[in-house]
Regions:
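Conserved AMP-binding/adenylate-forming
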Residues: 300, 399-401, 408, 413-427, ...
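AMP-binding/adenylate-forming catalytic core of the ANL superfamily
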Residues: 144, 169-194, 365, 372, ...
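Conserved AMP-binding/adenylation subdomain of ANL enzymes
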Residues: 289-316, 324-370, 385-386
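Conserved C-terminal "lid"/linker of ANL adenylate-forming enzymes
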Residues: 221, 608-613, 622-624, 642-718
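Adenylate-forming
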Residues: 189-208, 344-348, 367-415, 427-438, ...
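Conserved AMP-binding A3 loop
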Residues: 112-118, 260-262, 268-292
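Conserved AMP-binding/adenylate-forming core of the ANL superfamily
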Residues: 29-33, 80, 98-157, 174-179, ...
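Structural core segment of the AMP-binding/adenylate-forming
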Residues: 161-245, 368, 375-376
Length: 718
């Protein structure tokens, strides 16, 4: 019998009706209640997900200000304990906790590695006891330098289960970038990999490990994960331990291990701002706030169910990420609700010599992924590469696509939808498969006329939201470990738009007067606190850096730094960073619209625009483009680019100059570095505007530095 896959948000609304007597005719009404009665809404989330605490909380929220709100004071939780709740029922259902592949194993055709729920629990207990034996106590920091492998999840859960504070950097980061982060938090333990595989290359990181050990005097212990030579790993760090040995215990003490009950606001992890200028800001989130917001987001809005629950039986969740991006944390959160997590470690685009954007799709086909998420740039690259998803294996289990990281263009979304229509048709032709309206292959995302769950009938008919695939486009941030805007399987799905503001998120577009506007582009603000907002920045006395980062423009109101339009129907469009805005002759626009126009051209692989504004002078706006191999930016190509902008946007946004470049500078998380390049071209020195170690491609900066010098000398540009 297939799972019905009723929308998770529908089940929650039915529960509200049956247990609270609350009935909402529209999502807008539900959202309005969630942001005006914070205590009632977040208490309902606590109760709906049956979050456990040995002690009661005496208030849902006290001092509801930003910063400074206190949530569920008196309650005790533990992220790892919430994960362990699913060990027995998921194991009884025969479902794994984690399925994983790397580049080599996928290419060789090997089966995925499988980590069962009981084995996950045993390894976590073993490592936790080892950390405790090394002197790790609640509040101590444990730093990790690990790739996206199951061992990283184990290390995280072991750390937080005993009250340690986790902090993670990806092993593609260099020594300086890692030390810029870890030195600020003085970790006592380092768990690290001595090698990483990316783009077909096995990269030795043993030198970096030695440099990290030397550069972190606070360290008392090192644990090394070695993919190739576990026996030799201990030779790397004197007094260190092998990861396999630290997770090998299987005795009465590991069987009896129980995660600590911790205060709701006990520090969980430390994540970092992008670090484009100065030292990265170490952002501290708490156990309880992260846990409760992750459940609400992942389940209600991403529609990712528990893998052993009848409504979502067999759910398999994948969101591609490196460990340097907060979406690794989002992938990890699948375990909170008993969802099987499918993870891939490596380059989703193949190798430099042999690009292959089918890699992740073949991975998803082999593992039977049901929810497939990635950065918006991944889908755009797939489209530009011209791949055919119907030739990537059986993808019919995928019922939802998730995107984030940057705005997803309407063109890319339409391409993906058309691809899945072909996937569906190809499946019918291959084996006569006819996709059901409801089930694991829930292509149409329909629940109209479906039998209601126990407790009452459905409140109203649910319309189809996206044939033949549902897109869950979200926008949030590392800053608060969550999302402000995202999906709802019951709402209309319009290409290029996100469906709604999320429950509990009092998000608005504010104009220059600080007033909310509809149908206009404004500053994205959040006027009410969220449980997952930062507890503080590590070492930030008096919250000086925290306040200047989010609350300097509007005291007491979170300014996120994005341009947002809320449409009359309640959907949302993100137009890019508000600090990288184009303002041409009084007409303001986010950069994403221009990128959509330019990058829709098959000749263009990537692009970046900056608007250089001056007092008393017209702005100067150069456009930088990466063209396909063999193409040259001649007069005809410039005319093509300008015409695309003129047609799609307005003649006002035609750039003053266009320049062909080899690469667009990007952060480690893949975001275009518009603001640093803008500052560089306005005359600031490169060392003041960008941290090269926080970049994915720092070598490309040399061209922009030379360009800025030529521009300053009057040789190019205005």
């Amino acid at each position: 019998m297939t799972a019905p896959h009723l929308p998770q948000i529908r089940l929650y609304q039915n529960w509200l009706r049956d247990t609270r007597g609350l009935q909402f005719d529209t999502y807008d009404a539900l959202w309005e209640w969630s942001v005006t009665d914070l205590a009632a809404f977040w208490q309902s989330i606590w109760d709906y997900f049956e979050i456990e605490s040995p002690t009661p909380h005496h208030a849902v929220v006290t001092n509801p200000t930003m910063p400074g709100a206190q949530w569920f004071a008196g309650a005790q939780v533990n992220y790892a304990r919430q994960v362990f709740r699913h060990v027995a029922p998921a194991s009884a259902a025969g479902l794994p906790a984690v399925l994983s592949h790397g580049e080599h194993s996928l290419k060789s055709g090997s089966p995925a590695r499988e980590l069962s729920w009981p084995e996950l629990q045993r390894q976590v207990a073993s490592l936790a006891l080892h950390l405790r034996a090394q002197g790790v106590r609640p509040g101590d920091r444990v730093a990790a330098y690990l790739p996206n492998i199951p061992e990283t999840m184990v290390a995280f859960l072991a750390t937080v289960s005993i009250g340690g504070v986790w902090s993670l950097c990806a092993p593609d980061m260099g020594t300086s970038a890692v030390l810029d982060r870890f030195k600020q938090i003085a970790p006592t333990v380092l768990i690290a990999a001595d090698s990483v595989t990316y783009g077909g290359r096995d990269i030795d990181r043993s030198d970096v490990l030695a440099e990290l050990r030397a550069g972190l005097p606070s360290l008392r212990h090192v644990i090394v994960h070695s993919a190739s030579d576990e026996a030799g790993a201990t030779n790397l760090i004197a007094g260190g331990a092998r990861f396999t040995w630290a997770t090998s215990r299987n005795d009465a003490e590991t069987a009896a291990f129980d995660p600590l009950w911790l205060p709701f606001d006990h520090p969980l992890w430390i994540v970092y701002s992008s670090g484009t200028t100065g030292l990265p800001k170490p952002i501290v989130h708490g156990h309880g706030g992260t846990l409760i917001v992750a459940l609400a987001l992942k389940v209600l809005h991403n529609d990712i169910g528990c893998s052993y629950a009848p409504n979502s039986f067999g759910e398999r969740y994948h969101w591609y990420s490196s460990t340097g991006w907060v979406m690794w944390n989002a992938q990890l959160s699948g375990l909170l609700n008993g969802t099987t997590c499918c993870i891939f470690d490596g380059n989703p685009g193949g190798t430099k010599e042999q690009p292959d954007w089918t890699t992740l799709w073949r991975f998803a086909a082999q593992l039977g992924v049901t929810f497939f998420g990635a950065g918006a740039a991944f889908f755009a690259n797939c489209m530009k590469a011209g791949i055919d998803l119907s030739g990537c294996g059986d993808l019919r289990n995928i019922r939802a696509l998730g995107t984030t990281g940057s705005p997803l263009s309407e063109e890319t979304q339409r391409w993906g939808t058309a691809q899945f229509r072909q996937v569906q048709q190809h499946g019918v032709e291959e084996d006569g498969f006819s996709p059901p309206q409801q089930g694991p292959r829930d292509w149409l995302c329909q629940t109209a006329g479906a039998a209601a769950p126990s407790g009452g009938s459905a409140l109203h008919e649910v319309k189809s939201v996206g044939e033949p695939i549902w897109w869950c486009n979200i926008s949030g941030g590392t800053d608060f470990a969550g999302a402000f805007i995202g999906g709802n399987r019951e709402l209309p799905l319009v290409p290029g738009e996100m469906q709604c503001r999320l429950l509990g998120c009092a998000v608005y577009a504010w104009n220059e007067a600080g007033q909310p506007v509809i149908g206009e582009v404004g500053e994205l603000v959040c006027t009410q606190p969220l449980p997952s907002m930062p507890l503080y920045f590590w070492g930030d006395t008096g919250n000086v850096r925290l306040i200047s980062s989010y609350f300097d423009m509007y005291p007491g109101v979170w300014r996120h730094g994005d341009w947002l339009k809320v449409t009359a129907s309640g959907s949302c469009i993100i137009y890019g960073r508000s600090d990288a805005t184009i303002n041409r002759h009084g007409l303001r626009m986010g950069t994403s619209e221009l990128y959509s126009a330019i990058e829709a051209l098959p000749e263009v692989l990537d692009s970046m625009v900056v608007d250089l504004e001056y007092l008393g002078r017209d702005s100067y706006m150069p456009l930088f483009v990466v063209l396909r191999d063999g193409l040259v930016l001649d007069a005809a190509m410039k005319a093509t680019l300008n015409n695309a902008i003129r047609t799609a946007l307005s003649p006002r946004f035609v750039p003053n100059d266009i320049f062909q470049v080899a690469e667009i500078p990007r952060t480690l998380s893949g975001k275009k570095q518009e603001l640093p390049i803008k500052k560089l071209l306005l005359g600031q020195p490169i060392e003041k505007v960008v941290n090269r170690d926080a970049m994915a491609n720092p070598a490309c900066l040399d061209w922009y530095v030379e360009f800025a010098a030529r521009r300053a000398a009057g040789q190019v540009g205005a």
